[in-house]
Amino acid sequence: MDPGRSHIETIIESSTHKFILFDEPTEETIPYFKDLMKKNSCINIVRCCEINYDASLFEGVKIHELCFKDGNVPPKDIIERWLEILKQAFIENGKQKTTVGIHCIAGLGRTPLLVCIALIEDGMKPLQAVEFVRSKRKNAINSPQIKFLKEYKASKKAGCKIM
């Protein structure tokens, strides 16, 4: 493991999903992350950054590309694709809680932002989602992203789950 990286992985759970948030894998850390995905029955990884590693090294895991600019908020089409990935993963897992891996470069901006969106869709209030994620992953989510989340409206009726 790279000792300079302080946020290796964080697990956050909602009623329908378990999220594994992590830094971008490197040649040295891919074996660790492959093992982590296997131990958590994770067959979906969402990558929010540019391609910097060989995705084929994660055999048996589907890599979804949801890239958007670091420090920014996701465009509407990225949010829609994120929610569709979560819905599909839930269905493929027989409507049982399913595990989704998600990463950007440091795992502190884009990654926790998308997880907050999922938590809001799952019925959590926006600032509750931010506080919950930050309680698990220190320094996550910047001020413009928090402003975006405060104004974010779940696509479903209040209290409905991602499904």
Swiss-Prot record:
Active site: 70, 104
Cysteine methyl ester PTM positions: 160
Membrane topology: Lipid-anchor
Disulfide bonds, paired cysteine numbers: 49-104
GO MF annotations, alphabetized: protein tyrosine phosphatase activity
Catalytic activity: O-phospho-L-tyrosyl-[protein] + H2O = L-tyrosyl-[protein] + phosphate
EC number: 3.1.3.48
Cellular component GO terms, alphabetical: cytoplasm; membrane; nucleus
UniProt entry tagged with the keyword Cytoplasm: no
Lipidation (S-farnesyl cysteine): 160
InterPro entries linked: Dual-sp_phosphatase_cat-dom, Prot-tyrosine_phosphatase-like, PTP, Tyr_Pase_AS, Tyr_Pase_cat, Tyr_Pase_dom, TYR_PHOSPHATASE_DUAL_dom
Cell compartments where the protein resides: Membrane
Pfam (any one): DSPc
SUPFAM superfamilies, per the entry: (Phosphotyrosine protein) phosphatases II (SSF52799)
Positions annotated to bind substrate: 110
Record: residues binding phosphate: 105-110
Family: Belongs to the protein-tyrosine phosphatase family.
Name of the protein: Probable protein tyrosine phosphatase type IVA B
Species annotation: Dictyostelium discoideum (Social amoeba)
